[in-house]
Amino acid sequence: MKKEVVVIGGGIVGLSCAYSMHKLGHKVCVIEKNDGANGTSFGNAGLISAFKKAPLSCPGVVLDTLKLMLKNQAPLKFHFGLNLKLYQWILKFVKSANAKSTHRTMALFERYGWLSIDMYHQMLKDGMDFWYKEDGLLMIYTLEESFEKKLKTCDNSGAYKILSAKETKEYMPVVNDNICGSVLLTENAHVDPGEVMHSLQEYLQNVGVEFLYNEEVIDFEFKNNLIEGVITHKEKIQAETIILATGANPTLIKKTKNDFLMMGAKGYSITFKMPEELKPKTSSLFADIFMAMTPRRDTVRITSKLELNTNNALIDKEQIANMKKNLAAFTQPFEMKDAIEWCGFRPLTPNDIPYLGYDKRYKNLIHATGLGWLGITFGPAIGKIIANLSQDGANEKNADIMLFSAFFRD
């Protein structure tokens, strides 16, 4: 079976690549090992949080994380063991936690955040129907020290709105008196990731993109400097261009003789109903404990915790209990009705810079992975970048790849 473009992976990055490649007139086939109904992209917080928000690795994060570990509130949990890559990842994470690297990354976040928002607008114009709100991201601070630190970065550009603890309750009625205040980052937005995924799937199917669900790619056939065949557990597929967007699963990446500095970070979310009068008015992030709380049509979702160096795909009830406990410290008592607990693995690089671009060996292979917790934020932008790259034909001819790919970042 021969295809023009094969996208391996049906998450937000894979679907966004399929969307933009189709827009260029290509015939696209998406291969997804599951049924496409509940992957990692579905469990995302839904934040489009590219603006005025630092990456995970930033100045002070190491000491802050150690302090939070003592209180069981740290955003990262490390399962230490005999895994050299974990220690390489941690070393790179620590090295990236400096002002110069953070400044550059935040500038890139802004550039590609606007591109993602443009792409979401295009999707809505194309008739897709999903929850999309451009009403800012409320950064809630529970430590006076970090609140004061954030206030020093705010300017009069209109991108920031500084709120007292009392004013914060107008946006986040559920908070209690244990908060210090908040900053509304006005340029940010949020979506319901499940609705985005379903709408994008439906649109792509309607315009002729082929989907091979429940079909797992298990290997490749190589010939000289090309991938001659994509081998699934059902068939062999040939393709002119192959886009590898398999997220946190390193198996296929390793089969292409690559081993990216990327960890599968296990993240958690709880989706529930709560009293309408207490629901957040916009997407919110408890900055000091790295917990997002996002309103949707009928429900609210909290997301938190990233575990590194674990392959356990089961929900850790202790982690769920810690999330609830940490949230309860800063909110009024309320009942989480019809709660749905979830966990999934995100492809996390130590500096939040993804692996994008043509493979160094195989000329018809393009990589698109490593967005970690920022898949919904940058997925549509990555799809556009990859489509443009396919026209350029080489990494060095595409400025976005040179700027935003880990292949070209120290």
Swiss-Prot record:
One of its GO terms (cellular component) is plasma membrane. It catalyses: a D-alpha-amino acid + a quinone + H2O = a 2-oxocarboxylate + a quinol + NH4(+). Its EC number is 1.4.5.1. InterPro entries: FAD-dep_OxRdtase, FAD/NAD-bd_sf. The keyword Flavoprotein applies. Coiled coil: none annotated. Gene3D superfamilies: D-Amino Acid Oxidase, subunit A, domain 2 (3.30.9.10), FAD/NAD(P)-binding domain (3.50.50.60). FAD binds at G9, G10, G11, I12, V13, G14. GO terms for molecular function: D-amino-acid dehydrogenase activity. It is a peripheral membrane protein. Keywords: Cell inner membrane, Cell membrane, Electron transport, FAD, Flavoprotein, Membrane, Oxidoreductase, Transport. Its cofactor is FAD. It comes from the Bacteria. It is found in: Cell inner membrane. Its main location: membrane. Catalyzes the oxidative deamination of D-amino acids. Has broad substrate specificity; is mostly active on D-proline, and to a lesser extent, on several other D-amino acids such as D-alanine, D-phenylalanine and D-serine. Mediates electron transport from D-proline to coenzyme Q1 in vitro, and is involved in the electron transport chain from D-proline to the c-type cytochrome in vivo. Belongs to the DadA oxidoreductase family. PANTHER family: D-AMINO ACID DEHYDROGENASE (PTHR13847:SF286), SARCOSINE DEHYDROGENASE-RELATED (PTHR13847). This is D-amino acid dehydrogenase. It comes from Helicobacter pylori (strain ATCC 700392 / 26695).
